[in-house]
């Protein structure tokens, strides 16, 4: 295996054992970006000179016996939406083309405090709101495995850079699949953590207090071990909340696969997937069963997935429409008032009118009153309870992230 294919935790061990220097590793990644990223277009903000300087500092610290942290000397990139001091943060939006961060965001600071340094930032779609990664400022990012196909979005540049061997570690954000679908399309690891575990401070265009509802920050990497390492670094309360709570995540409650109880949800009539995706998901479940895990292909959480998705759409669109202008909001309000209520029930969706239900939920969410938001939030809490009850019995729910593999631009 080539060194650029190794995980960040493996690379950190090599740096600390002096098998490779941080400067050598950083230069290797820079050389690969300069040679291959012209076709992929993943690393769109470049800080190569600063990265070499930071790598040299890491090597000097190591020579003095200093340990900078679990990522000592690791060069990395990060999603363009994160603030890095003196670098542009645009979210792919022309209106913010000249927006320059005055300081590092919290996640960036925490990665630096763990010993990492940054070579640049990776591409996103406009306003982080697409399953591909194109914007008019930086252009289109391609999938490293097939340049004709998308890398996913909105953390598409992050996943593409990892898959291409341009970086040791990445971080993205996710409100509707923005970490998960790029990881799926590019064949890397991604983790969308529970909301509230990782502060969003420094992942915004305009300072936003409190954190956005539903949206989360999280890592992308080349291994599950890297995800754990990065989560441990990123997680924990922001400074303003640190006196009120502390993070205490549960430790794994098993030591071998034979102790695991795994539920497999390979497809569903509400969200059918391709035969290939269903077969691969099923194969993983069958393999786990052969290795001794207790596996069920029938176990499900106790709620209606059609209703759950419609409720999610209400809450999602209420977040996405927060900055909507009065004129546009009035148009959507009129459309909502003209909806055919008989087609907007969960029963109607099950009978075949799913699209109408989801479109109606999206429109309603954009103009949701506070009273109706509270009702939707109440339903969300009931769903949380259903999930908690499910995971009291099952350790893992294995299901597809997307219905298909990466599709063409």
Regions inferred by a protein language model and the residue ranges of each:
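DPxDG-like acidic metal-binding loop motif
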Residues: 85-98, 164
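Short helix-loop capping/hinge segments that flank enzyme active sites or metal/cofactor-binding pockets
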Residues: 71-91, 256-265, 317-388, 404, ...
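Conserved small-residue hinge/capping positions at short loops/turns
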Residues: 67-90, 117-119, 123, 129, ...
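Acyltransferase
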Residues: 22-26, 56, 273-301, 326-337, ...
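An N-terminal boundary/leader segment
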Residues: 1-54, 290-292, 362, 366-367
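A short helix-breaking turn/cap at a secondary-structure junction
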Residues: 192-285
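Short glycine/serine-rich loop segments
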Residues: 103-234
């Amino acid at each position: 295996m080539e060194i650029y294919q190794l995980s960040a935790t493996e690379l950190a061990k090599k740096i600390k054992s002096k098998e490779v220097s941080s400067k050598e590793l950083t230069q290797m990644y820079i050389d690969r970006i300069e040679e291959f990223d012209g076709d992929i277009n993943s690393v769109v903000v470049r800080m190569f000179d600063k990265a070499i300087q930071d790598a040299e500092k890491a090597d000097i610290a190591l020579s003095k016996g200093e340990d900078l942290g679990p990522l000592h000397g690791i060069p990395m990139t990060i999603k363009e939406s994160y603030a890095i001091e003196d670098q542009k943060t645009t979210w792919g939006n022309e209106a913010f083309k000249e927006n320059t961060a005055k300081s590092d965001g919290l996640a960036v600071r925490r990665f630096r405090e763990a010993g990492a340094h940054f070579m640049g930032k990776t591409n996103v779609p406009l306003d982080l709101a697409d399953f591909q990664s194109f914007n008019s400022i930086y252009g289109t990012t391609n999938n490293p495995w097939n340049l004709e196909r998308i890398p996913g979005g909105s953390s598409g540049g992050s996943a593409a850079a990892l898959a291409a061997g341009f970086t040791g570690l990445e971080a993205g954000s996710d409100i509707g699949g923005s970490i998960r679908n790029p990881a799926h399309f590019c064949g890397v690891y991604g983790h969308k953590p529970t909301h509230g575990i990782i502060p969003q401070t420094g992942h915004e265009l305009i300072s936003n207090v409190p954190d956005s509802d539903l949206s989360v920050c999280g890592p992308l990497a080349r291994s599950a071990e890297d995800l754990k390492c990065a989560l441990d670094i990123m997680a924990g309360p922001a400074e303003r909340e640190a006196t009120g709570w502390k993070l205490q995540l549960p430790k794994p409650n098993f030591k071998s696969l034979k102790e695991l109880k795994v539920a497999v949800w390979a497809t569903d009539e509400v969200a059918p997937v391709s035969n290939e995706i269903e077969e691969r998901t099923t194969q993983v479940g069958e393999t786990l069963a052969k290795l001794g895990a207790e596996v069920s292909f029938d176990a499900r959480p106790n709620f209606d997935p059609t209703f759950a998705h419609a409720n999610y759409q209400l809450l999602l669109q209420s977040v996405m429409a927060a900055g909507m202008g009065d004129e546009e909001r009035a148009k959507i309000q009129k459309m909502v008032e003209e909806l055919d209520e008989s087609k907007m029930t969960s029963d109607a969706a099950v009978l075949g009118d799913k699209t109408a239900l989801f479109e109606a939920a999206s429109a309603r969410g954009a103009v949701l009153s506070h009273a109706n938001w509270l009702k939707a939030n109440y339903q969300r809490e009931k769903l949380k309870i259903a999930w908690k009850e499910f995971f009291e019995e099952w350790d893992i729910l294995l299901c597809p992230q997307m219905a298909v593999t990466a599709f063409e631009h």
